[in-house]
């Protein structure tokens, strides 16, 4: 019977066949240990010469790294194994040999590994990170479905940029100009006026010339929008959502976290509610910490976010940023017209902003005035202005960056490892 490695617990004491790749191998004169990988997990296969005979043992000893094969044998429990089970191999059938596999068990530099990203994905570490990424995606759908959100797919090609920025990828759309989407937010606002609570999950593209460990050119975002939600309502959704993601990974990816050496004691503290401070309070805190380079009205850089987050064990919301450094669609605070009703969620341990969100302006005249302040072409946004013309309501939304969230929860230093094929400032291959 053919099974996968993650089914091994169901077949203890039985003879089965597994299709796999050889991740690694070690052998002595009379026994060979095969580390097998099939995409669902890893398992050790033990080949004993006295039990399988000379021919099968010779085949096993000659196997090269990443050769694909069928292995047949009996599944046994093994508490010494990191996988919990191993196979007593009775036969080996080679499917396709692998010659001179470039990523050997020795250490390799990052650029070399990125050049071979299509092969690096096969490694134990990358397998663990991708499993955690998948769990975060799965749990996101579970959370929003349970909360009554409708999944909406906004366009990737757009005729305008939601934040009025120049950091756009331009392309031709037949005879018109088009851009790769930086965010589906404006379209999600339209969907919220139709369906109440909606969310999207898809790629976004930002032509930022950044080389930091937090930035990708192409990344994925979860973007919910909620009609009749004020800022505090949205913050409660955000903290419950992030706490739900962390718990899902702790519950379902413990082996992967262990494999990555992640200290889960940090993650086990991620229970809502999360602390909140205003932008002004954050500036004061930074001055107390010796950051004299920043003044009220400046945006935060990575060192500032890290210093603020270090004061808390959980993610922290920074709310009420200056109006001048935030996008046009954010409403002023009724009690202070110099700040807007918004918040960024800053992850602990130096991982920076993982969520940005705000209330949205729903008054037509106010929205038009803000667009004039930003020198935006109102004709290009006429459809968006229609939302305020025809029965708009107070509403809020946010965007969670998937790769930064994966990096934080998995303890991965650089976001380039949190997406299968990263697009960086200097990398469009493979």
UniProtKB/Swiss-Prot annotation:
Entry's EC annotation: 6.1.1.22
EC class of the enzyme, as a word: ligase
Pfam family membership, one: tRNA-synt_2
InterPro entries tied to this protein: Aa-tRNA-synt_II (IPR004364), aa-tRNA-synth_II (IPR006195), aa-tRNA-synth_II/BPL/LPL (IPR045864), Asn-tRNA-ligase (IPR004522), Asp/Asn-tRNA-synth_IIb (IPR002312), NA-bd_OB-fold (IPR012340), NA-bd_OB_tRNA (IPR004365)
Signal peptide, first to last residue: none
Any one of the GO BP annotations: asparaginyl-tRNA aminoacylation
Keyword Nucleus among record annotations: no
A cellular-component GO term for this protein: cytoplasm
Domain of life: Bacteria
GO molecular-function term, one example from the UniProt record: ATP binding
UniProt keywords, alphabetically: Aminoacyl-tRNA synthetase, ATP-binding, Cytoplasm, Ligase, Nucleotide-binding, Protein biosynthesis
Swiss-Prot/TrEMBL catalytic activity: tRNA(Asn) + L-asparagine + ATP = L-asparaginyl-tRNA(Asn) + AMP + diphosphate + H(+)
Entry annotated with the keyword Cytoplasm: yes
Subcellular location(s) per record: Cytoplasm
Oligomer status and interactors: Homodimer.
Record-stated family: Belongs to the class-II aminoacyl-tRNA synthetase family.
HAMAP family membership: Asn_tRNA_synth (MF_00534)
PANTHER family (alphabetical): ASPARAGINE--TRNA LIGASE, MITOCHONDRIAL-RELATED (PTHR22594:SF34), ASPARTYL/LYSYL-TRNA SYNTHETASE (PTHR22594)
UniProt protein name: Asparagine--tRNA ligase
Organism of this sequence: Listeria monocytogenes serovar 1/2a (strain ATCC BAA-679 / EGD-e)
Encoding gene (name): asnS
């Amino acid at each position: 019977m053919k099974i996968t490695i993650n089914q091994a617990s169901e077949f203890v004491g039985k003879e089965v066949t597994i299709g796999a790749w050889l991740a690694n191998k070690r052998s002595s004169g009379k026994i060979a240990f095969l580390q097998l990988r099939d995409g669902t997990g890893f398992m050790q296969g033990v080949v004993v010469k006295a039990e399988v005979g000379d021919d099968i043992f010779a085949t096993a000893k000659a196997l090269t790294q990443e050769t694909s094969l069928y292995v047949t044998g009996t599944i046994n429990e093994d508490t010494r194994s990191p996988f919990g089970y191993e196979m007593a191999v009775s036969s080996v059938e080679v499917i396709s040999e692998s010659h001179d596999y470039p990523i050997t068990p020795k250490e390799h530099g990052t650029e070399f590994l990125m050049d071979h990203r299509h092969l690096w994905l096969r490694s134990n570490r990358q397998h663990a990170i991708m499993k955690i990424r998948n769990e975060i995606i799965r749990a996101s759908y579970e959370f929003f479905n349970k909360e009554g959100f409708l999944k909406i797919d906004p366009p990737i090609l757009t005729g305008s940029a939601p934040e009025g920025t120049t950091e756009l990828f331009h392309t031709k759309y037949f005879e018109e100009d088009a851009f790769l989407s930086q965010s589906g937010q404006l379209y999600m606002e339209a969907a919220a006026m139709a369906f109440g609570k909606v969310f999207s999950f898809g790629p976004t593209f930002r032509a930022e010339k950044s080389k930091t460990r937090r930035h990708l050119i192409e990344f994925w975002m979860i973007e919910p929008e909620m009609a009749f939600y004020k800022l505090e309502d949205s913050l409660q959704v955000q903290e419950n959502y992030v706490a739900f993601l962390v718990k899902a990974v702790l519950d379902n990816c413990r082996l992967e976290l262990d494999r990555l050496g992640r200290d889960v004691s940090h993650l086990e503290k991620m229970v809502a509610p999360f602390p909140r401070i205003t932008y002004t309070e954050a500036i004061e805190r930074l001055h107390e910490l010796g950051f004299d380079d920043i003044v009220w009205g400046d945006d935060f850089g990575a060192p500032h976010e890290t210093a603020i987050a270090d004061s808390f064990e959980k993610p922290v919301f920074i709310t009420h940023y200056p109006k001048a450094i935030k996008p046009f669609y954010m409403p002023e605070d009724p009690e202070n017209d110099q700040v807007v009703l918004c918040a960024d969620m800053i992850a602990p341990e130096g991982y920076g902003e993982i969520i940005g969100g705000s209330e949205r302006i729903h008054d037509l005249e106010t929205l038009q005035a803000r667009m004039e302040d930003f020198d935006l072409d109102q004709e290009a946004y006429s459809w968006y202005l229609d939302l305020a013309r025809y029965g708009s309501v107070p509403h809020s939304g946010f965007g969670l960056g998937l790769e930064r969230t994966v990096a934080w929860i998995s303890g991965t230093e650089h976001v380039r490892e949190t997406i299968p094929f990263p697009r960086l400032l200097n990398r469009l291959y493979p």
